[in-house]
Amino acid sequence: MASAPQTKPGIRDALIVVDVQNDFCPGGRLAVQKGDEVVPLVNAFAGRFENVVLTQDWHPPGHRSFATSHPGSKPFDSVRLAYGEQVLWPDHCVQGSDGAALHKDLCVPHAQLVLRKGHHRDVDSYSAFLEADRKTRTGLEGYLEERGIKRVFVCGLATDFCVAWTALDARKLGFAALVVEDACRAIDMQGSLAAAWEKMKKAGVERIRSGDIF
């Protein structure tokens, strides 16, 4: 029987808080159901980490992942782009907009890095490590390696997209990865949540609860 992971954060651990932004919370352009419920949890345990990274979806107007950029298409349709299949989204997290801002109640003042992703007009970005073309790096890998980070804890929005892609890429790049399940919320589109958890399990991503951190 496999032993439970050691979940108390140390100096070789980093917390990655993914896309806790207004457009992904109730009332936003691409709201994740109960997405704002992660905020008090993140605020409660983030202080346990010396190393904290916040990510922020940061799209230019007319981004290729927006349904409005594809005449005749509607949100949640899929199209084929140069790098593969792309879900089309409502316009969201447009650079400089209120929707792109981090949730007003998110309070992680000791976060050292806010990493903006999705700013290349023709490529979407779910993962905090790699753009959706699977070639363009965000620089997060090097940032963590320079600080001696060996393990990442991932939370935020949404479980089945940006959280999962971040955790999966962390594993591919050699980091241990844990997802804080109750500090995430999902879109869950056509079984995408169950599929994401299955992929993460196969990749060796650990699934924990916020209470395990304290």
Pin down the residues of each PLM region.
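Alpha-helical scaffold elements lining the catalytic groove of polysaccharide deacetylases
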Residues: 122-147, 151
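Gly/Ala-rich phosphate-binding loop of Rossmann-like dinucleotide-binding domains
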Residues: 167, 171
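Short beta-strand immediately N-terminal to the catalytic nucleophile in serine-hydrolase-like folds
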Residues: 155
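Active-site acidic carboxylates
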Residues: 2-119, 146, 150-151, 172-179, ...
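Short catalytic/ligand-binding loop motif for oxyanion handling, primarily in non-cytosolic enzymes
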Residues: 60-64, 123-124, 162-163
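Short Gly/Pro-enriched loop/turn and capping motifs at secondary-structure junctions
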Residues: 158-161, 184-187
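Short alpha-helical
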Residues: 53, 161-162
